[in-house]
Structure formats: C-alpha cells, structure tokens
Amino acid sequence: MNQMMTFLQTNGGELLYKTGEHLYISLIAVVLGIIVAVPLGVALTRMKKGAGAVIGFVNIVQTLPSLAILAFFIPLLGVGKVPAIVALFFYSVLPILRNTYTGIKGVNKNLLESGKGIGMTGWEQIRLVEIPLAIPIIMAGIRTSTIYLIGWATLASFIGGGGLGDYIFIGLNLYQPEYIIGGAVPVTILAIIIDYVLAVTERKVTPKGLQGMKEVS
C-alpha cells in the first residue's frame, strides 16, 4: 500500500497524461477503423462474389499475434504513435466490418423494394433505410472493437507508442508491482467508462423498435 501511495504521489500528473495518451491512441485507431470498415462492409453487400474472401482475409489478420503486427510496422514506419495506431487500426476493422456486413445483409428486402417503389436511389436506400436498420449491429461492432483496442493499446509502449502500457512494462522489467497496478487499473477503468458511454450512445442512435437486437458474434 505504501509503495502504491508513493507511486501515485510521484507519478500522479504523468498518470493522467498517460491515460489521455492511451485513450488518444485507441480512439484514433477506432475512428480509422469505422471510416474504412463501415463503407467496406456496405460495399461487400453489393458484391455477389468476393465478400467471403475479404472477410476471411481480415479474420486471418485478426488472428496474428499483436506483437508480431507491431514489429512488422517498425521497418516501415519506425517507432512511436504512428505505427502503433496503424497496427491497432488493423485490429479494429474485423468486428466493425463483420457487423456492418451482417447488419446490412439482414435488412428486409421488402423494405428495399418499397424504397425503390417511391423513387429512392441506391445511396438514399443505404442512408435512409439500410444504415438506420442495421445501426444496432454496427454499433455493437464498434463497441466491441473499441474495448478490445483499449486493452491492446497497452502493447503500444513496446514500440514507443506511449500510453499506460509504459507503466506495465516498467513494472514487469523492474519487478515493481505498483507500476503494473498503476497501468492495469486505469486501463480497466477506462474500458468500463468507454463501454458505458458507447452503450448509452448505442441506445440513443438505435430506433426504439430495434433496441432488442444483439451483436452478431
């Protein structure tokens, strides 16, 4: 307990900075994942062939060890936040892509035909019919991806990306439990807070009649 108090007194200000840094790395990667995965998921629903291959490839990338992905980008991008964010971006794509694809494919075809009947263009059907109906599943994928990345972002310190992982690695290398706790506990709290915020957001953007839908696993 004394060691933990000493750690907090010594590193209190830096701990807040590291927490913000950790959140920044995670959220930038998730935002990039959303920008890529949602349009790609919609596009795949328009493909008669190839959708399974694309999702299968992303699945393979997801199974690669996190440290291997981080190490892969060192020769290409060096060390620091950029390679860490790029590596985390790759991990963010699968849950969002899979849920977007599944959510859009699950939209009732009769509704799409009705949209065509009143003169909707393809883009209008996506924007006004398909995305709103698929939003519970899409948001569930975003939520899953974000929580995963907050945990995986601890590995960013392996390549100089910063964040709360710095404390965990220092604690492991120097056998100082207070540093491990000082990094791990804020990560856990951060994940819980972000999960709650995203859960509230999910309820706000989901039409009331669709709020019973669950994430596709």
UniProtKB/Swiss-Prot annotation:
One of its GO terms (cellular component) is plasma membrane. SUPFAM superfamilies: MetI-like. GO terms for biological process: amino acid transport; glycine betaine transport; transmembrane transport. InterPro entries: ABC_transp_perm/SBD (IPR051204), MetI-like (IPR000515), MetI-like_sf (IPR035906). The chain crosses the membrane at residues 23-43, 52-74, 84-101, 128-148, 150-170, 180-200. It is found in: Cell membrane. Induction: Repressed by OpcR. Residues 19-198 form the ABC transmembrane type-1 domain. It is a multi-pass membrane protein. The complex is composed of two ATP-binding proteins (OpuCA), two transmembrane proteins (OpuCB and OpuCD) and a solute-binding protein (OpuCC). Involved in a high affinity multicomponent binding-protein-dependent transport system for glycine betaine, carnitine and choline; probably responsible for the translocation of the substrate across the membrane. PANTHER family: CHOLINE TRANSPORT SYSTEM PERMEASE PROTEIN OPUBB, GLYCINE BETAINE/L-PROLINE TRANSPORT SYSTEM PERMEASE PROTEIN PROW. This is Glycine betaine/carnitine/choline transport system permease protein OpuCB. It comes from Bacillus subtilis (strain 168). The gene is opuCB.
